Amino acid sequence: MSEKTVGSVAEQYGQRGLAERIMSAVRQAFPEGASSDEFGDFDHYHAGGRAATEALAAAADPARGCIVLDVGAGLGGPGRWLATHYDCQVTCLDITPEYCEASEALTQFTGLASLVKVQQGDALHTPFDDQAFDLVWAQNAFMNIEDKKGLFKEMRRVLKPEGKLAFMEVMAGPTQGSPHFPLPWADRPELSFLEQSENYRKKIEGAGLEVLLWEDMGPWLSTVTAKPDSGGLETDIYVDNLSGKRGNWARSRTEGTVVQWRAVCTRP
């Protein structure tokens, strides 16, 4: 991403004092501490919430104790979930400093600091060694990245041979036209880089990855029931205009300008 785009994306998600606000609410809700599972959907800010995390894990089938990179990790909910349920060693990468600060605090609070690390950085230029990860994971993160070819080349670079890339992402739907803004990942069109699923797949395969699973998750998404945010925690603590963004997301899905897709790929 260009420096301008990086700054704009970080600004989209970041808010001054975000970590302090989140942790104040968390400590009030759970004065005696909590496991990551007790947060419900609170730290899974993506379509389908924690149910989507569980569904992606079922498809990816990570080995216990595997080494995971979560790209666009946000507050780190999926990373902590993988650490809790699969004993994975997870690095949560996010472009937004405020999200990284909050993610670290939540990881400490839930007692998972030995398994989950947080790294601030750009998914197109990660600081990791070649072939460092067994699994690269992403949920609703790629929509803010314009250079999909560069993204998938970087994901392949950091994957071990036979490692997997698993993601659930929003793509451009069959209906021509723009979705309605603001959306959960973009307040304005300049921050949203959606592509048709066929183009996605071509770029993935062009980067040297083999597609194992390629699935439209629209029918599944329409059946999902949210897992209540526990202890009174609400996602609007850290997301402005949440109801408006969710409304535009639902409307855009209904009109067919956006779709949700799940994929599992491997590095041969």
Model-based region annotation:
Residues 29, 46-64:
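Conserved alpha-helix/loop element of class I SAM-dependent methyltransferases that forms part
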Residues 124-135:
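A short acidic, Gly/Pro-enriched loop at the edge of an enzyme's catalytic core
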Residues 149-164:
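A short glycine-rich, Lys/Arg-flanked "PGG" loop and its adjoining helix->strand segment in the class I
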Residues 170-191:
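Short, glycine-/aromatic-enriched active-site segment of Class I SAM-dependent methyltransferases
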Residues 192-208:
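Short alpha-helix
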Residues 213-268:
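Conserved Class I S-adenosyl-L-methionine
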